């Protein structure tokens, strides 16, 4: 469904999910993915979205783990942090807990794991924070580094940007029980581009951006 010439302004990310979750009296365990390119604001959005709207208090963040392992050079322990994060995800899934994690979606390996979780009764909810270009992603990461945050090599950012969008289109949107695609070009004015899910009719609020992201013909 296209809602022409309208882009819904999000004062905060809680409003993105209210229509999806407010009517669910009894909810199954859920895995929530906060996705988007490097520098898109995933970690910044996590607190209000997860603790506020979704009531999910288990957020596995490999970047935070890396900082805990090596505060001044987290990039040096990225592999080890990733291994610890994956182990924690498996632990939470085995405990049938609801949990969340962030990713650029540049890896395809989450898809079969998510399918397996869904087969056991889990629901998969996806929130993708979109940026219009890899160049903006690079600029956001550079800004983060100037503020004391962790760096990501430029070539890695570009690879993840394209790979994440490709996998979003072909793997993760078709798999999600619910998905929200959010324009985070302006951090003070996030806008909902489109939403939908397995049993939720897709609604497109910004047709031009939707066609651009999904590579649809005009």
Indicate where each model-derived feature is located.
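Conserved lysine of the Walker
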Residues: 42
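N-terminal pre-Walker A segment at the start of P-loop NTPase domains
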Residues: 8-16
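NTP-dependent small-molecule kinase module
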Residues: 170-218
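A glycine- and Lys/Arg-enriched "phosphate-lid" helix/loop adjacent to the NTP-binding pocket
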Residues: 122-170
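P-loop (Walker A) phosphate-binding loop of NTP-binding proteins
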Residues: 37
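Conserved substrate/cofactor phosphate-moiety recognition/catalytic segment
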Residues: 46-97
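Glycine-rich phosphate-binding loop used to anchor ATP phosphates in small-molecule kinases
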Residues: 77-131, 164
């Amino acid at each position: 469904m296209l809602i022409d010439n309208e882009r819904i302004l999000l004062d905060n990310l809680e409003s993105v999910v209210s229509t999806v979750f407010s009517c669910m009296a009894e909810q199954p365990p859920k895995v929530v993915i906060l996705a988007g390119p490097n520098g898109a604001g995933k970690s910044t959005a996590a607190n209000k979205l997860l603790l506020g709207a979704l009531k999910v208090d288990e957020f596995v963040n490999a970047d935070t783990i890396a900082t805990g392992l090596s505060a001044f050079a987290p990039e040096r322990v990225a592999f080890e942090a990733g291994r610890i994060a994956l182990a924690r995800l498996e632990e939470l899934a085995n405990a049938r807990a609801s949990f969340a994690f962030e990713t650029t979606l540049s890896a395809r390996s989450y898809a079969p794991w998510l399918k397996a979780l869904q087969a056991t009764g889990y629901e998969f909810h996806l929130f993708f924070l979109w940026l219009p270009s890899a160049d903006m992603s690079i600029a956001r990461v550079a800004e983060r580094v100037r503020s004391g945050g962790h760096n990501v090599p430029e070539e890695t950012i570009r690879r993840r940007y394209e790979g994440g969008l490709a996998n979003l289109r072909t793997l993760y949107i078709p798999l999600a029980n619910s998905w929200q695609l959010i324009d985070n070009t302006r951090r003070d004015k996030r806008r909902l581009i489109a939403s939908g899910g397995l049993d939720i009719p897709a609604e497109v609020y910004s047709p031009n951006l939707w066609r651009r992201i999904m590579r649809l013909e005009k």
